[in-house]
């Protein structure tokens, strides 16, 4: 275990093993990959049972970036910085440099012994914890705000923002909760009902092709949810200026990039979705965070453009 692989066509190619057999401070071999994250064009990873942050250098080579003194649970990016969550109460931020002297402790969360998961929601970093399955939100003044507990669960596992809403998986019942605001979480269902086990996990999560996905343990199944309708572009935009168009027609949502269709929702009956509301229209700021880039020549139409009209607009 502990290997990382990349997909080339229809075959998997080894990218080596994080940390080799044993790090200088590791009590066990690095035999399990716990999390991977891309930061500033480089791939970083952490192991499950040992300390240390590792950076991929190409081929089968990994650099051991060191340890701040405790095991890490996961890592993620927010506002241009890499963050790691520890087997403890801390959240750490890394901005530059080659060693752990550049890491800044951002939090010591009360009553928390593991900071397990991370997401970006409404412009803030949010983290999930053990042993009370609470979610905390980072505020601009540096404070951490308790967003409530997920039922009677013990740990918040995978978290994702899907169709403008924050979802989180749990342990020990393998449930998925939806955040409804003001500290209130609603259980959307139990994904793992394996009998005669102590812990069931809704562990990993992703948004793909307009749906929310969760992986479960010990059942080993992948479950999906479609709430409302959405169309998602599941790859990064190419560098430079891109022409984007989002169109809602009578029964379909369509996303275009440079005049070409790149995503479509499943079909729906328009009458089932009354979107009238009193909320302000926000451009360049969504349910994740602010857009990092530049926007020009914004146009809003009163009707749905046809595909040929989008192509003409894209030039």
What is each residue range found by the language model?
Residues 160, 184, 227-315:
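Extracellular glycan-associated modules
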Residues 47, 86, 129, 170, ...:
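Glycine-rich, histidine-containing beta strand-loop boundary motifs that form or position
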Residues 28, 77, 86, 130, ...:
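A generic fold-level signal
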Residues 6, 37, 255, 259:
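Short aromatic-centered micro-motifs
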Residues 1-32, 38, 42, 48-73, ...:
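Trp- and S/T/G-rich repeat-edge/linker motifs of beta-rich repeat architectures
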């Amino acid at each position: 275990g502990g290997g990382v692989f990349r997909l080339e066509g229809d075959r998997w190619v080894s990218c080596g093993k994080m940390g080799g057999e044993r790090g200088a401070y590791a009590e066990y071999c690095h035999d399990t990959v716990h999390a991977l994250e891309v930061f500033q064009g480089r791939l970083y990873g952490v192991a499950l049972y040992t300390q240390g942050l590792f950076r991929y250098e190409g081929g089968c080579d990994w650099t051991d970036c060191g340890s701040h003194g405790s095991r890490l649970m996961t890592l993620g990016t927010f506002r241009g910085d890499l963050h790691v969550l520890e087997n403890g109460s801390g959240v750490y931020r890394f901005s530059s440099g080659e060693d752990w002297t550049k890491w800044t402790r951002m939090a010591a969360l009360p009553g928390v012994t593991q900071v397990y998961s991370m997401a970006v929601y409404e412009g803030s970093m949010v983290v999930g914890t053990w042993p009370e399955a609470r979610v905390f939100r980072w505020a601009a003044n540096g404070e951490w705000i308790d967003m409530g507990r997920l039922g009677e669960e013990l740990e918040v596992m995978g978290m994702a923002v899907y169709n403008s809403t924050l979802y989180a998986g749990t342990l020990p019942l393998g449930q998925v909760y939806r955040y409804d605001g003001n500290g209130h979480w609603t259980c959307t269902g139990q994904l793992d009902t394996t009998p005669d086990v102590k812990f069931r996990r809704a562990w990993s999560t992703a948004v793909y092709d307009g749906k929310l996905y969760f992986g479960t343990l010990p059942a080993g199944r992948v479950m999906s949810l479609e709430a409302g309708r959405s169309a998602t572009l599941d790859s990064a935009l190419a560098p430079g200026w891109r022409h984007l168009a989002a169109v809602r027609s009578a029964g379909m949502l369509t996303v275009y990039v440079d005049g070409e269709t790149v995503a479509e929702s499943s079909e729906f009956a328009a009458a089932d979705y009354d979107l009238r509301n009193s909320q302000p229209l926000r451009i360049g700021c969504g349910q994740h965070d602010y857009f990092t880039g530049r926007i020009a020549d914004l146009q809003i139409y009163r009707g749905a453009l046809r595909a040929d009209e989008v192509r003409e607009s894209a030039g």
